[in-house]
């Protein structure tokens, strides 16, 4: 550039000499009788020549910069082609870019970026601007993930910036960036879909009314190294409606559709499918509502052990572990019930716990080995009080989350018409034994603990082709028949009440119906959501019930309850008349989010390992691995 400056100085000197010569020639020609030229004309001519020389100098400087910087056309081609390349090559290119930045002493992962407001707040604050308005005296800083990138030239880039389930347009203009064209193009060529960026600029709306932020500073904060799936373009597709709890949804419209990929890579599922984030927000609201409901009724939230010496409180197969220091076998809890009732004995009259339970059983559309429940225990209450509380809690929750008592649910698949489920209280109530006899036209012996009753139920299952694998205990046979004849009728919320004692070892006997208990199960959409009863508080009867369960266990029913001596001892100190209640949080979340698979409402559901991992896990251990 110094050579160019010297040339400019020389040219200006020559121009001055030319001007002097021209002036002398004009004076000479005047003496010779030619027409005189004015001094003003000569000055104008001199200025024009100076402007031409200045323009030439600037053009030379631009040409010099163009040689030093990559050509805009080639960079645009790279930006356009990088998402067309092989995914592995794309990943390797991104790694090379980061390595190059680090080699130059740059930190591609800044420690901090100060955000002035969230994207939803930005939309709320500036959404009322008129089309074409810019507020250049206001400065805001936003951060989020780039979900869409497009450009109209090397000097103008557009981004969709997503955060907190909302998006705003970023309109990056080279003329407002404080960078020269080459630096601007390099920065925005390296910004990719999926990257997290910080933007500092002023708010405004485009002429078409798109709320945007116009950055003066654009900072790459974190980099997405993988090529993200993108939704196929469909010019005829309607803009999807915003999903709300209680309404149907369509996972087939998701960007990432494959269930295996979605459940194994939940982070990617949530990045690409906005609705998935809403599902988990709804689940959190359900838990929050339950907690608030019980807190308002003066319940105390407590925590009880998740590892126990005895797997009690429910009829289920436990997970077994080992405590090395104590050298003893422990069981992951299948229910917190027995501990919570001991707290009632201790004088805490209303307690509840929301937490994980673990059952080593099958995995299907409504069962996961690790699941979440809420259990509460209320002194001086019975199962009638709990039915009323259940109606108030669930109907109130549905109304708060959806705006009404009725929800839509794709019970028969997303390709079929949805059903309507009505949570308007009061809920339907049916007697288990009486309704079963009525629907299946049975006449079950009254003494359900007798051999006669067991044989009758075995014959009934055979007659209706209801499968009940061994051991064919009376409790298991009844459960299978109820699943065949009663549960399918329970679409709207329905209480199945007054279960037999042989099916309810922890429930109190019915005060007027021999052989039955004061218990209910709430079914919705043919699945159990709640289980509750008036608690058995007679320690002598409780020991006898545990003894009966032991007989079932000895006959092969490994889900039968074991005797918990500590619990029985606590009952001997006196348990007040108490009502106990349990709710399956996961299944309720499924209903209110139109989810047909329990994995949809669990961030990280239980999955079989991928085939290659499974093969490695099952391979014999070598001495080195041992």
From Swiss-Prot:
Transmembrane segments: none
Cellular component terms (Gene Ontology): cytosol; plasmodesma
Positions in coiled-coil regions: 37-69
Modified residues (N-acetylmethionine): 1
Region (Disordered): 1-84
Composition bias type Low complexity, residue spans: 69-78
Cofactor: Ca(2+)
SUPFAM superfamilies per record: Class II aaRS and biotin synthetases (SSF55681), Nucleic acid-binding proteins (SSF50249)
Feature: DNA-binding region: 141-217
EC number, as in UniProt: 6.1.1.6
A single BP term in Gene Ontology: lysyl-tRNA aminoacylation
Catalyzed reactions: tRNA(Lys) + L-lysine + ATP = L-lysyl-tRNA(Lys) + AMP + diphosphate
Binding site for Ca(2+): 521, 528
Similarity comment: family membership: Belongs to the class-II aminoacyl-tRNA synthetase family.
Role this protein plays: Catalyzes the specific attachment of an amino acid to its cognate tRNA in a 2 step reaction: the amino acid (AA) is first activated by ATP to form AA-AMP and then transferred to the acceptor end of the tRNA. Promotes aminoacylation of non-cognate tRNAs and translational recoding of lysine at nonsense codons.
Protein name per UniProt: Lysine--tRNA ligase, cytoplasmic
Organism: Arabidopsis thaliana (Mouse-ear cress)
């Amino acid at each position: 550039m110094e050579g160019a400056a010297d040339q400019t100085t020389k040219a200006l000197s020559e121009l001055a000499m030319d001007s002097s010569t021209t002036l002398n020639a004009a004076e000479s020609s005047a003496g010779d009788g030619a027409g005189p030229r004015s001094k003003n004309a000569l000055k104008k001519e001199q200025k024009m020549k100076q402007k031409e020389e200045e323009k030439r100098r600037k053009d030379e400087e631009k040409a010099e910069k163009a040689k030093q910087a990559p050509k805009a056309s080639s960079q645009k081609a790279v930006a356009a082609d990088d998402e067309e390349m092989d995914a592995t090559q794309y990943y390797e290119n991104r790694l090379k870019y980061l390595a190059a930045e680090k080699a130059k002493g740059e930190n591609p992962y800044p420690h901090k970026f100060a955000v002035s407001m969230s994207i939803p707040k930005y939309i709320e604050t500036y959404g009322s601007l008129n089309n074409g308005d810019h507020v250049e005296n206001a400065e805001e800083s936003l951060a989020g993930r780039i979900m869409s990138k497009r450009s109209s030239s090397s000097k103008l880039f557009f981004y969709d910036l997503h955060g907190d389930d909302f998006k705003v347009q970023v309109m990056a203009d080279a003329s407002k960036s404080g960078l020269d064209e080459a630096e601007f193009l390099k920065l925005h060529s390296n910004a990719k879909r999926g990257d997290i960026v910080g933007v500092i600029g002023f708010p405004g709306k485009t002429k078409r009314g798109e709320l945007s932020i116009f950055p003066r500073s654009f900072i790459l904060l974190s980099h997405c190294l993988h090529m993200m799936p993108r939704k196929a373009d469909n010019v005829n597709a309607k803009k999807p409606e915003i999903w709300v709890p209680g309404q149907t949804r369509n996972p087939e419209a998701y960007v990432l559709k494959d269930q295996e990929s979605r459940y194994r890579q939940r982070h990617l599922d949530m990045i690409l499918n906005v609705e998935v984030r809403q599902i988990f927000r709804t689940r959190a609201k359900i838990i929050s509502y339950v907690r608030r409901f019980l807190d308002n009724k003066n319940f105390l939230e407590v925590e009880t052990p998740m590892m126990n010496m005895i797997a009690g409180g429910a009829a289920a197969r436990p997970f077994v572990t080992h405590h090395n220091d104590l050298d003893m076998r422990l069981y992951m809890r299948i229910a917190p019930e027995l501990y919570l009732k001991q707290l009632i004995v201790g004088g805490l009259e209303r307690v509840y716990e929301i937490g994980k339970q673990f059952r080593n059983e099958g995995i299907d559309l409504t069962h996961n080995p690790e699941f979440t429940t809420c259990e509460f225990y209320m002194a001086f209450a019975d199962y009638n009080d709990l039915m009323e509380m259940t109606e108030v809690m669930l109907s109130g929750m549905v109304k708060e989350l959806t705006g009404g008592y009725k929800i839509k649910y794709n019970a028969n698949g997303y390709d079929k018409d949805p059903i309507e489920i009505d949570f308007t209280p009061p809920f339907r109530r049916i007697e288990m034994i009486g309704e079963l006899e009525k629907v299946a036209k049975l006449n079950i012996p009254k003494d359900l603990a007798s051999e006669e009753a067991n044989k009758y139920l075995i014959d009934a299952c055979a007659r209706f082709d209801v499968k009940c694998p061994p051991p064919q205990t009376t409790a298991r046979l009844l459960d299978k028949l109820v699943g065949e004849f009663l549960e399918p009728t329970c679409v709207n919320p329905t209480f199945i009440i007054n279960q037999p004692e042989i099916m309810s070892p922890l429930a109190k006997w019915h005060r007027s119906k021999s052989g039955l208990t004061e218990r209910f199960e709430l079914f919705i959409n043919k699945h159990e959501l709640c289980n509750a009863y008036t608690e058995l508080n007679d320690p002598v009867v409780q020991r006898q019930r545990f003894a009966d369960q032991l007989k079932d266990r000895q006959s092969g029913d490994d889900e039968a309850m074991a005797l918990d001596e500590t619990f029985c001892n606590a009952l001997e100190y006196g348990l007040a008349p108490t009502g106990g209640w349990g709710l399956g949080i996961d299944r309720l979340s499924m209903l209110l989010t139109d989810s047909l698979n329990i994995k949809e409402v669990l961030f990280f559901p239980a999955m079989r390992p991928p085939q290659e991992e499974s093969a490695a896990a099952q391979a014999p251990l070598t001495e080195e691995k041992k």
